[in-house]
């Protein structure tokens, strides 16, 4: 990790030996990493659910790898600890039925399904959508454009989903019920 930080920012290496112990919560760890400008590791775990203090984390890590528990607070093991934290969060969220996401923008997009927020509006008719890609596809209704054209029979479609269903006719594939 020292070499990695040296390659990215030589001024941070001299501070590696002086790092304070890891904070007590994951929120604190995230803040801890942000304060030290470790941009490469701050996004390792961005959970919706934050577990109990590091006592549980130490127990979790011990169950998986007993050699890492004694080193949890050492700066050289922060990155590996964060990987264990990510695994801990994903497992905990799955147990509690909490949805987790790969991309940082995904929770915000997913929230729209619950709030009913539809920020993308058609200028022609005012119909609103949750995603800009859906609006782009919808706009073809007003223009008369049918971007999906079958090369075998020449039939054209506004929606890619309709086109994909149509392709099954030519392939002989049975429809999905």
UniProtKB/Swiss-Prot annotation:
Query: Which GO molecular function annotations are given, in alphabetical order?
Result: DNA binding; DNA-binding transcription factor activity; zinc ion binding
Supply the Pfam families for this chain. zf-C2H2
Q: Which SUPFAM superfamilies match?
A: beta-beta-alpha zinc fingers
Q: What InterPro entries does this protein map onto?
A: Sp4-like, Znf_C2H2_sf, Znf_C2H2_type
> Which segments does the record annotate as C2H2-type zinc fingers?
99-114, 120-142, 148-170
Q: Which UniProt keywords apply?
A: DNA-binding, Metal-binding, Nucleus, Repeat, Transcription, Transcription regulation, Zinc, Zinc-finger
Q: Name one GO cellular component term.
A: nucleus
- Compartments, as annotated in UniProt: Nucleus
PANTHER family from the xrefs?
ZINC FINGER PROTEIN, ZINC FINGER PROTEIN 781-RELATED
What's this protein's function?
May be involved in transcriptional regulation.
Q: What is this protein called?
A: Putative zinc finger protein 826
Q: Which organism is it from?
A: Homo sapiens (Human)
